[in-house]
Amino acid sequence: GYYRIAEMADYNPVAMINEQIQEREADDFGASVRATLNVLPIEGLKWDNFVSYNQQRYQSNSYRTRYYPSTIGQDGVASISNEYTNDIQYESTVNYSNTFNKHSIQTVLGYAYQRQTGEYSSMGNQGFDTDDGVTHKIGAGTSINEGMASMYSYKESNTYIAFFVRVMYNYDEKYLVSVSLRRDGSSRFGKDNKGG
């Protein structure tokens, strides 16, 4: 006799949807605060501060039954993935500006800090006796006993720091001099080049 395995295009898309489960949950949280302090009695001197925090949590559960076209013969395929990230930023600047006679000066002295952290994990298994509630009992698949299940997890963290100075001098609205200095450091830089 003769038979062939149908291409994906030969399958009913509605049936394909019914033979898989996709569950996703996401939580986002963010907050920021900015504050400015006028430093008296020095006129024109201000201290600015900004801080922000962002956090994200994401979970995805996926299951394709034994009748899903691409997983036929595998008795169902399940996977679970989790992701957690947060980002903290802080920036502080001291600003001074003043005008006297024909002279005008503006200066900024600043510091910036950022830290990003991420945690990631995933697991997959197949070979289930039933299609009910598989993503909540992923260890029930037979592939884990055969050493064929998959799992991984890792955590990463990166830090960025910067110091900067800007000075601008203007005389009589005709002559302008500007000087900027900046130094950056990051954990992403090479081992012997953390600052630049």
Indicate residue ranges for each PLM-predicted region.
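Transmembrane beta-strand segments that form the barrel wall of outer-membrane beta-barrel proteins
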Residues: S178-F189
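Short, well-ordered loop/turn elements at secondary-structure boundaries
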Residues: V108, Y171-D172
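Small-side-chain secondary-structure face that scaffolds active or pore-lining regions
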Residues: A26-G30, R34-D129, S187, K191-N193
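Outer-membrane beta-barrel transmembrane strand signature
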Residues: G1-V39, T142-R166, N170, L176, ...
